[in-house]
Amino acid sequence: MLTVTVLGAADSVGKSCIMISDRDRRIILDAGIQLHPRRSDQRSSPPAQLDDLSPDIDVVLVSHAHIDHSAYVPALYRWGYGGDIHLTAPTKDIVKILWKDHLKIEGETHYSLRHLNYALRNSVPHNYNQSFRLLDGISAEFYDASHILGSACILLDWDGTRIFYTGDINDAKTPFHDPIFINDSLDEPIDILITETTNATRPLPSRKETTSKLTQKLLQCYSRGGKAIIPSFALGRSQEIQTYLIQEFDTFLDSYQLWIDGMILDINKIYGRYLTEKWVSKRLLSFLKENGYKSPFDHEGIHKIDEILPTGGRNKKRAFLANQEQPVIILTTSGMIEGGPIYEYLGKFDLGSDPKNGLYIVGYQVEGTVGADIAAGQRQILLNNGFGGLYNVNLELEVKRFQFSGHASQGGLLEVAKYTSPTKILPIHGEPAAQQRYIEALNSPDKIIPPHSVHPEYP
């Protein structure tokens, strides 16, 4: 009997983990963690049962690098797993940074540096559209998911049963990726579709509309002599925003400089290694070639925080930038304003108290985070001082939120179901309301597998 067991993200977004198994074989798709708002004082949560299952797992596959899909992988080695990890080449490079950062933040809550290094040594990188053997009778293939660099949908062929796991997918055209395109990728129908449903209830504006609104707001901030602060996720959204801005502003960035801070700088370096047709859109490569750039991050209007002063640490450099009179754009972490340099810019260096300045939110904000509070209208906020204490910040700058998303719309999710022609569908990675809306829109109740159940017998 072939079973599909959802160990994480059954009816929420976070700690994604799925086990596919029969009597003799067990394969894990993703092993992420659930982060909690900093004020809760909670450590991150792992997938259910995975520690106990680890010694009996045969193979692990990772769809992409985001920590809600990958960050528990090193912990598997702590609990007895000894096999390989299959992922794309960019994902392998990115998780090295993200896993080490998580170890720095939470310590050895889930794994040690030894487990992390063991996981990296056992990571096997793959390209898209190339089938590879996992076990006797089981093969896998990665398809471009258009979510972030290296993100993949995973096709498993399990003794002839075809299982398609979307991971996180995007149907919007972004600078680095074309919309996910399924109909020419799979030559046979799918038996089981395991699909994310993140945006099944949320209408999304076009990228063109959203970027136009952002650039207009940045120009307004410039015209009043303010500093524009964009808190952003280090991976994916930040690279997208940088590329949009060099395309929209180009030489105007000579006078309205874009400064990059935080882990974004490390991720930029990895993106720079994979600027080929194999991993990014032809549109981006054409743009770079036409303008004489090897990378979007080579644009003369983009500046690294370390460039500011010849000596001194980053705090000194940030203070110098914050005290400059001319308008600038500061793109920095963290995206949900839960830590990182954004705290210093808003609080310590007092940019949050100047009405000329702007705080422009470009990412999803989890309930309970500082970013969610600000997006909801709260202007008296508490920030961590880095030494276990809190201090009050009164925000008087302009605050605007922009609807960027790295996940497929409801229409995109339904297109995937249409083109894969699955016999059964398991909706996951979405709130209950999103999953219910997806099921209703699909209008095929006989195909649905409840997320808390296992798949019935399959021939």
Q: Model-found features: residue ranges?
A:
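Proline-aspartate-enriched helix->loop->beta-strand connector
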Residues: 417, 421-427
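Hard-cation-handling environments
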Residues: 215-370, 428
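His/Asp/Glu-rich metal-coordinating catalytic cores
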Residues: 2-61, 66-70, 75-240, 244-253, ...
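A general structural motif
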Residues: 205-210, 301-316, 335-338, 380-383, ...
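Short, solvent-exposed amphipathic alpha-helical segments in soluble enzyme
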Residues: 21-23, 157-159, 180-183, 210, ...
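Short acidic-hydrophobic, aromatic-tinged amphipathic segments that line or gate anion-handling sites
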Residues: 121-129, 303-314, 450
